[in-house]
Curated annotation (Swiss-Prot):
Compartments reported by the entry: Cytoplasm; Cytoplasm, Cytoskeleton; Nucleus
Location of the FERM domain: 21-306
Reactions it catalyzes: O-phospho-L-tyrosyl-[protein] + H2O = L-tyrosyl-[protein] + phosphate
Pfam families (alphabetical): FERM_C, FERM_M, FERM_N, Y_phosphatase
Biased composition annotated in UniProt, kind: Polar residues: 760-771
InterPro entries: Band_41_domain (IPR019749), FERM/acyl-CoA-bd_prot_sf (IPR014352), FERM_2 (IPR035963), FERM_central (IPR019748), FERM_CS (IPR019747), FERM_domain (IPR000299), FERM_N (IPR018979), FERM_PH-like_C (IPR018980)
Function summary: Protein tyrosine phosphatase which may play a role in the regulation of lymphangiogenesis, cell-cell adhesion, cell-matrix adhesion, cell migration, cell growth and also regulates TGF-beta gene expression, thereby modulating epithelial-mesenchymal transition. Mediates beta-catenin dephosphorylation at adhesion junctions. Acts as a negative regulator of the oncogenic property of YAP, a downstream target of the hippo pathway, in a cell density-dependent manner. May function as a tumor suppressor.
Protein name: Tyrosine-protein phosphatase non-receptor type 14
Presence of keyword Cytoplasm: yes
Residue numbers carrying Phosphoserine: S314, S461, S486, S591, S593, S594, S646, S833
Record note on modification: Ubiquitinated by the ECS (Elongin BC-CUL2/5-SOCS-box protein)/LRR1 E3 ligase complex and subsequently targeted to proteasomal degradation.
Keyword Iron attached: no
Listed GO MF terms: protein tyrosine phosphatase activity; receptor tyrosine kinase binding; transcription coregulator activity
Length: 1189
């Protein structure tokens, strides 16, 4: 041969060497094994060989992966020949064994060996830095790992071996001294876990890792259909998409995905419910093929094994059931009740103890969670908004139930109690969108009484979670000294030294779950004879009774003893402190949308009953229904009124009463006491009549008249007693069992509207149809001394008179359903119940009477109309006489003087001069964090940034290592009351997760948005909450999932209920979103009264949320106010509310001084002279409304 090559001539063919190959597999404990396979062997065969060596039976959770030629981790296709696959794609024939399919709960893993390998995998994920965790979590995990790997600390003479053991993630670069300090902390953590078995420590380690961000996720860089670079990820719940800065934009659940395919370099996600396809682009075709194949494999696995694929309109919380005992842990753990005696229909086999868990859950496991409620609940069963935690995991499901019942708390804010109590009710997230907020509807007595008539369930088969459903055990009654006031405020004025005192320090302390669930905060015994909270609900109010031996029962105590204990009686009477139901159905806007919001927490506790709570309902309805028979009018002789009068007779009496009252306007009206009488009333003479006070508020305890207790008499008679100068309405009656049965059929319907222009009513004023303000209440002076008993108007008479025009605010679909139900009901069932819903013909007749009397009134008679309206609405004012009154009269500035001063400034142009003299920002302001280059894109307008000393600081994250958000703390003290706001810009598309992080960390419950999403064709604020009616009505922003529960449009503003869930901890919170939508693109709103109604809605919701949080937090959380840049309209809202507070409480009104003070906390507050002038217009309108009171 010319080249000197030698050919072998043995002619032997090595068959064995051609048909077999050896591959190496690195295990999770870093050991490497070799496996001899044939060239035709698949990856599945190799995996089974590895599992045989590890004694694994549950191999379907694991897989094999390799490093590609581009050093990317790639999973082996188990069904294809392994050698061919590795030769084509792998960098070297080295495989890695690992967990391919993560699970949301380690309890799914049945085998001990499986759990051990799973533990090795999650520990490897932590140590390699694939999961983000804080130093505290690193120490805790390291301590558990040492306990799992080495056992108890006392087996070693010292902890020196820890220096050679890998304890911390690879990316945790630290100095030697800091590393030594961390090692010592790990040694202490290891010592604290002494006595825990290694297997238990492994499970505890896994449980801790499951809460970390990024657990079980694989992420691939792709581009969306718009060409934006995003991360396409996959985990056990589905497929998610987030942008490069980390904000999670959307999650596609496994049940929503039809298929995953690829077309060249594009990946297509075909959705089932929507006729659309999500499209993503990769770098090359092979990448797209691999990702689509991987996603298809995961999709098939999780759907076949029914993991995170339950039917739900929103991603459910991950519920974990620990399979080990935590009794040896040194840290306090949330109290978890074991699943005992759970009986459920075969539709669902999972029991949720979450208060919002009314949707079917997983079909294969029984999970229990104690703190996944919409509102915070205590360990002893008391919840902060006046309810008792419904612990469904213990005896709370009967065999007849086919769905998970909700707690009496309005956790699902959009589902009324009447629907939940129906046996055929199927929860639907999508159909709950038209329901009004939880603080507006009233208890459905018809349903409650109907169930009560069917009889009580046996004690052993009842749900014990609601047996201690008593008003005394709610949070409202845990603090009986608190008063809830309506607008205008009537509370005592606090002494003050400085008009606007600035809070210098801004401490940001996060509320830990242990703080939120501290049972000591709610274990407040109720003393006999303590003051009660006043009831103010839309239907006849829940009357109080004398407190007799009240005892504080907790849910945990009741569950422990399995005893039925009836609730204690209601506390002793107290005057109402809110004006109930002055809001008619809205057409354009309602000024003061919900006056009865402030005490709605009391109503919520009797709103959504289970069958075993009927004794409470029975006791309440006995008191509620008494005034229904107490209708009288002045001018007729004493007669007997049968309690089973028809509707027409009672309505004629009502109209007669009103007509006689109108005719007697020339007679001065005496005082009406607002306190209910404890015993038989005795009429004495000497009603001294006093004139009306000046146009300013007297600080009294009540603006509404409460119910009157009936006597114990068996007589069904009503005696008419007339005072010389006053139309008297009195009653001394008891009703029979027949009437109670009739009351049980009362349909709790809101009254229909007038067929003409709708009236809009505020807490402070009623407006005529023409738009001119009408007085809503008049104040009569009441004597403290004197033996005479007071006169009172019952609530039934108020409802009869006001029923046509003054009803609860409901949504239009609800009104339609009410009308349909009216048509279906037979005429013979109309007595008494129709008091709550007058028919159209009666409404027309009453309108005619009102119009005729209105035309007759002239001169001095017209001036007395405010007093008449107050009387017809059952309103009176008890002004306490004495030295205190003299002091207030001497110091109070009449409303007319303040009104003239404000108008004079507007007319003389002094407002412009004031505004020009106020500096735009603080002279020596520091903006060090805001001006950092990495934070420049986080501000909408780079010239508008927060001061360093009072900026809102977020907990730093990997994406936001400075914790920056363009938001400022605004703290003002006026008259001894501290006001705390957070003024911020509207979130940008890439800062929505920062916004929700701020809301969560600052404990915010109310968000006031003073802009539309788009104005004049320009985007004013990115939408940072999900639209109602969209798929799932929920969206995920970083670590937070936001779900829209309801939306109520009130003309110039919209009220939205949101549920915010922290994905890592599973905790949830209710957030009210109030959006003002009538601000024009240029200028200011023309409808000043509408803007006032928006401010009143903010006040109402604030009072509601603060009352819910009483006892949990020492200070009320701030309100987030934002517009586009967070300075112009935001400043208008804050300044207007503060100045209105000054007017209400007779504080000195200095608008320019307050604005200067606000600008020292956030620059450019109120950007234009038009906005500054608008604040004055709001104050003028407020005073004009107040003049009529």
């Amino acid at each position: 041969m010319p080249f000197g090559l030698k050919l072998r001539r043995t002619r032997r063919y090595n068959v064995l060497s051609k048909n077999c190959f050896v591959t190496r597999i690195r295990l999770l404990d870093s050991n490497v094994i070799e496996c001899t396979l044939s060239v035709e062997s698949t990856g599945q065969e190799c995996l089974e060989a590895v599992a045989q060596r590890l004694e694994l039976r549950e191999t379907h959770y694991f897989g094999l992966w390799f490093l590609s030629k581009s050093q990317q981790a790639r999973w082996v296709e188990l069904e294809k020949p392994l050698k061919k696959h590795l030769d084509k794609f792998a960098n070297e024939p080295l495989l890695f064994f690992g967990v391919m399919f993560y699970v949301p709960n380690v309890s799914r893993l049945q085998q001990e060996a499986t759990r051990y390998q799973y533990y090795l995998q999650v520990k490897k994920d932590v140590l390699e830095g694939r999961l983000r965790c804080s130093l505290e979590q690193v120490i805790r995990l390291a301590g558990l790992a040492v306990q799992a790997d080495f056992g108890d600390y006392n087996q070693f003479d010292s902890q020196e071996f820890l220096r050679e053991y890998v304890l911390f993630p690879m990316d945790l670069a630290m100095e030697e001294a800091a590393l030594e300090e961390l090692t010592q902390k790990v040694a202490q953590e290891h010592k604290a876990h002494s006595g825990i078995l290694p297997a238990e420590a492994e499970l505890m380690y896994i449980n801790e890792v499951e809460r970390l961000d990024g657990f079980g996720q694989e992420i691939f860089p792709v581009k969306d259909s718009h060409g934006n670079s995003v991360h396409l990820g996959i985990f056990f719940m589905g497929i998610f998409v987030r942008n490069r800065v980390g904000r999670q934009a959307v999650i596609y659940r496994w049940n929503d995905i039809g298929s995953v395919t690829h077309s060249k370099a594009a990946i297509l996600l075909e959705l089932i419910d929507k006729e659309e396809t999500a499209l993503f682009h990769t770098d090359d075709i092979e990448n797209a093929k691999y990702i689509s194949r991987l996603f298809t494999t995961r999709h098939k696995f999780y759907k076949q094994n029914k993991i995170c694929t339950e039917q739900s309109n929103s991603p459910p919380p991950i519920r974990r059931q620990p399979t080990w005992s935590r009794s040896s842990l040194p840290r306090q753990q949330p109290y978890i009740l074991p699943p005992m005696h759970v009986q459920c229909s075969e539709h669902y086999s999972e029991t949720h103890t979450s208060q919002d868990s009314i949707f079917p859950g997983n079909e294969e496991a029984l999970y229990c969670r104690s703190h996944n409620s919409l509102d915070l609940n205590y360990l002893n069963g008391t919840v902060t908004n006046g309810s008792v935690c419904s612990v469904h995991s213990v005896n709370s499901l009967s065999c007849s139930q086919s769905f998970i019942q909700a707690s009496p708390v309005s956790s699902n804010l959009s589902i009324p109690g009447s629907d939940i109590m129906r046996a055929d009710y199927i929860p639907s997230h999508r159909h709950s969108t038209i329901i009004v907020p939880s603080y507006r509807p009233t208890p459905d007595y018809e349903t409650v009484m109907r169930q009560m008539k069917r009889g009580l369930m046996h004690a052993d088969s009842q749900s014990r979670s609601l047996r201690n459903l008593n008003i005394i055990n709610t949070h409202a009654y845990n603090q009986p000294e608190e008063l809830v006031y309506s607008q205008p405020e009537m509370r005592e004025r606090h002494p003050y030294t400085v008009p606007y005192a600035h809070q210098g320090c801004y401490g940001h302390k996060l509320v830990s779950p242990s703080d939120q669930m501290n049972p000591q905060n709610c274990a407040m015994p109720i003393k006999p004879g303590a003051s009660s909270i006043s009831h103010t609900v839309s239907t006849p109010e829940l009357a109080n009774m004398q407190l007799q031996g009240a005892q504080h029962y907790s849910t945990a105590h009741m569950l422990k003893n399995y005893l039925f204990r009836p609730p204690p009686p209601y506390p002793r009477p107290r005057p109402a402190t809110s004006t109930p139901d002055l809001a008619s159905h809205r057409h354009k806007y309602v000024s003061g949308s919900s006056p009865d919001l402030v005490t709605r927490k009391v109503q919520l506790s009797v709103k959504t009953f289970q069958e075993d709570s009927s004794p409470v309902v029975h006791q309440s309805l006995q008191e509620v229904s008494e005034p229904l028979t107490a209708t009288k009018h002045h001018g007729g002789g004493g007669g007997t009124v049968n309690k089973r009068h028809s509707l027409e007779v009672m309505n004629s009496m009502v109209r007669g009463m009103e007509a006689m009252t109108l005719k007697s306007l020339n007679i001065p009206m005496a005082r009406r006491n607002t306190l209910r009488e404890q015993g038989p009333s005795e009429e004495t003479g000497g009603h001294e009549v006093h004139g009306l006070p000046q146009y300013h508020h007297k600080k009294t305890f009540s603006d509404a008249t409460m119910l009157i207790h009936s006597s114990e008499s068996e007589e069904e008679e009503e005696t008419l007693e007339a005072a010389p100068q006053v139309p008297v309405l009195r009653e001394k009656v008891e009703y029979s069992a027949q009437l109670q049965a009739a009351l049980a059929r009362i349909p709790n319907r809101p009254p229909p509207e007038y067929p003409g222009p709708r009236k809009s009513v505020s807490n402070g004023a009623l407006r005529q149809d023409q738009g001119t303000p009408l007085p809503a209440m008049a104040r009569c002076r009441v004597l403290r001394h004197g033996p005479s008993k007071a006169l009172s108007v019952s609530r039934a008479e108020q409802l009869a008179v006001n029923g046509a025009s003054l009803g609860p605010s409901i949504s239009e679909p609800d009104l339609t359903s009410v009308k349909e139900r009216v048509k279906k009901e037979p005429v013979k069932e109309r007595p008494v119940s129709e008091m709550f819903s007058l028919e159209d013909s009666i409404i027309e007749r009453e309108m005619m009477i009102r119009n005729l009397e209105k035309q007759k009134m002239t001169g001095p008679q017209a001036q007395k109309r405010p007093l008449m309206l107050a009387a017809l609405n059952g309103l009176s004012v008890a002004r306490v006489s004495g030295r205190e009154d003299g002091h207030h009269d001497a110091t109070r500035v009449p409303i007319d003087e303040r009104l003239r001063a404000l108008k004079k400034k507007l007319e003389d142009g002094m407002v412009f001069t004031e505004y020009e003299q106020i500096p735009n920002k603080k002279a020596n302001g520091v903006f060090s964090t805001a001006t950092l280059p990495e934070n420049a894109e986080r501000s909408r307008i780079r010239e508008v940034v927060p001061y360093e000393e009072n900026r809102v600081e977020l907990i730093p994250t990997k994406e936001n290592n400075t914790g920056y958000i363009n938001a400022s703390h605004i703290k003002v003290v006026v008259g001894g009351s501290e006001w705390h706001y957070i003024a911020t810009q509207g979130p940008l598309p890439h800062t929505c997760h920062d916004f929700w992080q701020m809301v969560w960390e600052q404990g915010v419950n109310v968000i006031a948005m003073v802009t539309a999403e788009e104005e004049g064709g320009r985007t004013k604020s990115h939408r940072y909450w999900p639209k109602l009616g969209s798929k799932h009505s929920s969206a995920t922003y970083g670590k937070f999932k936001v779900t829209t529960k309801f939306r109520t449009d009130s003309g110039c503003y919209a009220t939205t209920g949101l549920k915010v869930k922290h994905l890592l901890s599973g905790q949830e919170r209710t957030v009210w979103h109030l959006q003002y939508t009538d601000w024009p693109h240029h200028g200011c709103p023309e409808d000043v009264q509408g803007f006032l109604s928006y401010l009143e809605e903010i006040q109402s919701v604030r009072r509601h949320t603060n009352s819910v949080l009483e006892g949990i937090r020492t200070r009320h959380p701030p309100i987030v106010v934002h517009c586009s840049a967070g300075v112009g309209r935001t400043g208008v809202v804050i300044l207007s509310e503060l100045m209105i507070y000054c007017l209400e409480h007779n504080e000195k009104v200095e608008v320019p001084t307050m604005l200067r003070f606000l600008r020292e906390q956030r620059m450019f507050m109120i950007q234009t002279i038009a906005q500054y002038k608008f604040v004055y217009q709001v104050l003028v309108q407020f005073l004009q409304n107040s003049r009529l009171i």
